[in-house]
Swiss-Prot record:
Protein name: ATP-dependent helicase/nuclease subunit A
EC number: 3.1.-.-, 5.6.2.4
Reaction(s) catalysed (UniProt annotation): Couples ATP hydrolysis with the unwinding of duplex DNA by translocating in the 3'-5' direction; ATP + H2O = ADP + phosphate + H(+)
Lineage, top ranks: Bacteria, Bacillati, Bacillota, Clostridia, Eubacteriales
NCBIfam families to which the protein is assigned, alphabetical: addA_Gpos (TIGR02785)
Gene name in the database record: addA
Amino acid sequence: MNVGKTNWTEEQKEAIDTRNCNLLVAAAAGSGKTAVLVERIVKIITNEENPVDIDRLLVVTFTNAAASEMRERIGDAIVNKLCENPNSRVIQKQLALIGKSKITTIHSFCLDVIKNNFHMLDLDPDFRVGDETEIILLKNETLEELFEDKYLQAEYTSKGINKNNNSIEFLKLVESYCGNKNDQVLFNMVMNLYNFSMSNPEPYKWLKKAAERFNVDDDFEFGDSLWAEVLMKNIQIQLLGMKGQLIESINIINSCASIESYRENLEVELSMLEKLIVASNNYEKLYEELKNVQFKTLKRCPKDADKEKQKLVRDLRDGVKKSLSKISEDILSQNSEEIKEEFKVLYPLMKTLSELVIEFDIRYKDKKKKRGIIDFNDFEHMCLSILTKSDESGNIVPSETALKIREKYEEILIDEYQDSNMVQEVILSTISRKDTENPNLFMVGDVKQSIYRFRQANPGIFLEKYNSYKENKDEKNRKVLLYKNFRSRKEVLDSVNFVFKQIMSVNIGELDYDDNEKLNLGANYEEIEENLISHSAELNIIEKSEDNTEIKENNEDEESVDNIMLEARLIGRRIIELKENFKVLDKNTNVYRKAEFKDIVILLRSTKGWANVFSDELKNMGIPVFADANSGYFDAPEVKTMLSLLQVIDNPRQDIPMAAVLKSPVGGFSVEDLIDIKVIEGDTFYDKLKVAADIGDDEFSVRIRTFLNRLYRWRKESLYTPIDEFIWYLYTDTGYYGYVGAVSGGIQRQANLKMLFQRAKIYSETSYKGLFNFINFINKLKLTSGDMGSAKILGENENVVRIMSIHKSKGLEFPIVFVGGLGKNFNLMDMNNPVLFHNYLGFGPEYVDYKKRISHKTLAKEAIKNRIRIETLSEEMRILYVAFTRAKEKLIMVGSVSDIKRSVFKWAVNLRSNQNKISEDYVLKSKSFLDWIASAVIRHKDAENLRDIMDTSKENIDNLVCDPSSWRVNVLSRNDVLSFNQLLLEEEKNINEKLTQFYKRLKEIRSSNYESVYIEEIKSRLEFKYRYEKAAELPSLLSVTELKRNINEDNDEYATKIFTPSLVKKPLFLEEVKKMSPSERGTAVHSVMQHLDFSSISCDMSIKNIRHQIDDMVFRRILTEKQAESVNINRILKFFQSPIGSRVIKAEKVYREFPFQIRVKSTEIYNDLPKIYDDENIIVQGIVDLFFKENDEIVLLDYKNDYINDENLNETVKKYTYQINYYKRALEIVTGLKVKEKYLYLFYTGDTIKIE
């Protein structure tokens, strides 16, 4: 199935070998574009006749992971070339230069340009990149200060202290779009507009131009505006859809003479529609033509007329009337004069909005400058300012710096070109020779996979070149189409093509899915007869409601957990069937094998609210699952508890957080306790607690006093401790970290707490400090960035089913792909914002009369709303394409509807059409992926059971789309899905019944005179012992310490001696106060040795120097005071004064607390295991105290704090030799270097013992 390195298609060869032109490679999904890009680069740099050094190529990718993979693949290819031609100096040179290669992300390239030319900017050379946390806080702070200043200026103006019309307009802006509650709407508007404008090469110019569009003069005609042009195009799509509906109505009349009386009305209305379509090229003409729209009453049909056909025609006609009425309402609501007056009112508001964003950016830049930081927007815009200048006409042209960089690169290669934005396009254009006689721009991508418009990616950049570049070989601007897919089976490709050739068009999808765009088979899958499940595409539709009488059409916006569970259960059942009965081609062995869990992925448009439900349901069905979700973190109980504790420490007079803490394991109070506290006198829980603490000396009062004392200590500690260290201090002081580790799901819970600590650590490195600011940051993070996914504790190579968003799946492939949640409505909520933004059309505001408190949408907003809807649905279509094209062997779609009959009638609108494509009007009005998929599939011969749901199913339908794809369409009720679990229970019950009958029969046999041979045979089968039963007792993982501990023990009883799981450490808050044990003192010494700054240590240093470092460790919460006091500093000093200590200080590289894992045969660890266990491996893990390099060899050092005397010295050395030898073995495996010496250092005696 894999494409061989030399077995390129003709199109791939052209993409690899074409030179001396600007080349656009349109690469379909699975067409091997990365392999082509790598081969092109390798051929350029290893050309013996005309080689180009790799550091003279600029390769731009859009993620760091992609850049790393590209560099690695190119490096491997160079090595392969060198093996073929080991004496080539050209190839040798390229291998040496690979480290200097410019294979980078666009942001990394921009950062390099900034660093090399910072003198051209007003930028501190010691600038740093601001952390995301810091940037969010700084933006919010800047905008809040700006708003405060505007309010203050407005107040001064109202009092006549100064005259500032701008501040008055600011208040009007607030009044118009914020209502009476707060100014959050305007705050979000400014922030969103700022982020949006930054994708423009000249944001200030764009902002001012967008506002000036409303500065109309007396000659202004709306019909000549860009808004009218967009409105007309959208209306034309709708009118063509209406025309199709009327033609369908007339066709029904043609087949049914009993409703012939409807024909005259419909033909008149069809003629009226055709006039409107002609007029839709001109706003004024359409305006006049709409005035003539009228629908006369339909003539009566005979009593014996076909009622079904009669209703169908009337419904189609009513749909046309409704749509046309909406268009008339929008267009005829205002004439040009009224629009002009409205724009004059809006102009000062839009101008103020633009100026507000510009002023915000100026202030934000100033704050960043003072802190010496830049953000990701600065990467591109600062780079742009270095590489460009304006000519006399104000046009952007390359600067002298850009021209110098242009000379450096022989070719510029851009991967994932469909995801570029305008700023990136200008940057790369300035340093390329694309407009010269020697063009050198290579661009590869697939516009059908452009799914990052929310990051301001602009697929129009790719499309402009795609539509203008030619395929001719002698063209300066040339394109090559890679249309073969080497990933998927024919069944998958056919089903993808069948859907998209019907729904994707230039108007919706921004590309016509024709023969040039369809996926063509390139993979070579051998047929496999023993598969019990076909490779046909599957569409599973669940009717999620039992009672269809009260269903609202739009209720798919918010799914209940119960409804999501239905899809999860259906998918779970299908996974179980596939695992048992489906075979996949193993990519490593190229041999068919049974499907495993890791072969399966479940893709969702959004994981929020879905992934956790899916995960829980699949786990309940015994299916291991890994959900790569971006939500659920802040809802985790352990995270909520710690955040509540932080809030209480910051301000204890907050009842809800206080109640949460008291009821948690940290507080240890019951619900009954809280009720008792609640009735005590006081305004807040905190006040009540203080009263209760003084009531008496009973157990309840003592517990409260203990809690308040701890709270006091925590509050005091928070004042001078960095937030990350303070959080970890709370984990240990409360014992909460240990507690959550001991309960169900402990590993995940502890990982979530670690994630909170890491977030605090990042925060503490910013210019913001303090507990209050951190809590404020977390609250804003919830509001602005939304939730985060829980900490990841499962690796990506585990044998589990994966759940992920479609966006995260881009670039990946899986043998079996489920696409779920297809019935969920598209998210078009952003179109309801009071002011819309569009790169081409500018602003689309609502008109608001804040004095009368009335508002209505403007035609400018309606135009932008229509345009955004088309662009959003085009993006959604591409997202669906990405989801479908992840599948290699099996594609399964799952969606839910409320009323299956109503949905089928909606999908069947295009069923009688003789057009291959579904009408654009229908595609535009669709509300979900399922609407698109089902309306296409219902036209396929295999969807008979879907058509059977319609009452007209007996009618012969001649317009099914002829297509080679094969489909399996299933329609299930809610009860069908819920019965899956019942079936599983019944199967289990049947097995139990059979076992009961078997044992009953066995008793009869034993009591009868049957031949003893049969009894012995049955007995032997029942008492059968599995040959490898000891494998179940072997551990998967052992520590070196456990090996050492058991080396001298009899290891026959594996489970009891070694593999008894250790209990989770008892939480600190449950432990009694006691002296430190020898092992705890040893841990303290190890911590000191791990964190000592060796670079500041010399052989003649004093105890004072070491004491200072240990005190610093206490301050940083690395050690407790108790641990620090237990450390014998003289012994530490003695170590560094020893010969081995001196070598450590002088070593070129020292590694401390180095963790490792190695695979060891079980028979090597347990000598008495039979040879049949040779293939059973055990992971041995450990931590090496210290090793250092000397002349590319390793010196290993293990140190111990044990009590040693002359009597037990030899025994101690012998005890640890086994352990040290494992360390040696591990280091040689992991580092590839030889361990030349091994030492054991004994702190108690100061002896250094060489281990032979």
